[in-house]
Amino acid sequence: MKLRWFAFLMVLLAGCSSKKDYQNPPWNPEVPVKRAMQWMPISEKAGKAWGVSPRLITAIIAVESGGNPTLVSKSNAVGLMQLKASTAGREVYRYMGWKGQPSTSELKNPERNISMGTAYLSILEHGVLKGIDDPEVMQYALVVSYVNGAGALLRTFSSDRKEAIEEINGMDKNEFVDHVAKNHPAPQAPRYIWKVQKAMDAM
């Protein structure tokens, strides 16, 4: 009986430990940031064209692909900024007035990938997230929306977009991150914010 109780206790502790590690496991941004920095000239060009910080673009590249332009994920996210052709890619195409969606080969092209990823960030900022006043909160909202969708983020505040933006504007960046950690349906969302910020700090 004691042996069974000890085994149960060890499993319980292991579960608690793994949950804690998942929330904030070690991640060294040095190598992925160094690899992502090689694409900075393209990021600067795209950032200037779309009004997006090149440092944010580079940080997303570091976190998403580690600077590998040919990376394809299990969910078919492609390239440096890990764009899905059927979602972000299609949205950028629609915004530009083009038909269809980008091909895999197009998304593996560093310049095209960064251009479309940056365009998508701009579309989010000046579209569904428009109205967020604090620049730091906006940046965090962009990061979460980029990886998990803007709709999922806004619904954690309200089903009404205007009310959601108003609630966000009542928060500072720390309160926003805390809200995301407690309410976002994707458990990786707060960690993604942390990793992008860590990558930016490493530049």
Swiss-Prot record:
UniProt entry keywords in alphabetical sequence: Cell outer membrane, Cell wall biogenesis/degradation, Lipoprotein, Lyase, Membrane, Palmitate, Signal
Q: Where in the cell?
A: Cell outer membrane
Q: Which reaction does it catalyse?
A: Endolytic cleavage of the (1->4)-beta-glycosidic linkage between N-acetylmuramic acid (MurNAc) and N-acetylglucosamine (GlcNAc) residues in peptidoglycan with concomitant formation of a 1,6-anhydrobond in the MurNAc residue
Chief location of this protein?
Answer: membrane
Residues with N-palmitoyl cysteine lipidation?
16
Known EC number(s)? 4.2.2.n2
Tell me the domain of life. Bacteria
Which positions make up the signal peptide? 1-15
Which SUPFAM superfamilies does the protein's record reference?
A: Lysozyme-like
> Its topology with respect to the membrane?
Lipid-anchor
The record's annotation in InterPro entries points to: EmtA, Lysozyme-like_dom_sf, Transglyc_AS, Transglycosylase_SLT_dom_1
Alphabetical list of Gene3D superfamilies matching this protein: 1.10.530.10
Q: Name one GO molecular function term.
A: lytic endotransglycosylase activity
- Which GO terms fall under biological process for this protein? cell wall macromolecule catabolic process; cell wall organization; peptidoglycan metabolic process
One cellular component GO annotation, for this chain's record?
A: cell outer membrane
Q: Where is the lipid attached (S-diacylglycerol cysteine)?
A: 16
Q: What does the UniProt record say this protein does?
A: Murein-degrading enzyme. May play a role in recycling of muropeptides during cell elongation and/or cell division. Preferentially cleaves at a distance of more than two disaccharide units from the ends of the glycan chain.
Q: Hey, which family's this protein in?
A: Belongs to the transglycosylase Slt family.
Protein name per UniProt: Endo-type membrane-bound lytic murein transglycosylase A
From which source organism is this entry? Enterobacter sp. (strain 638)
Q: What's the name of its gene?
A: emtA
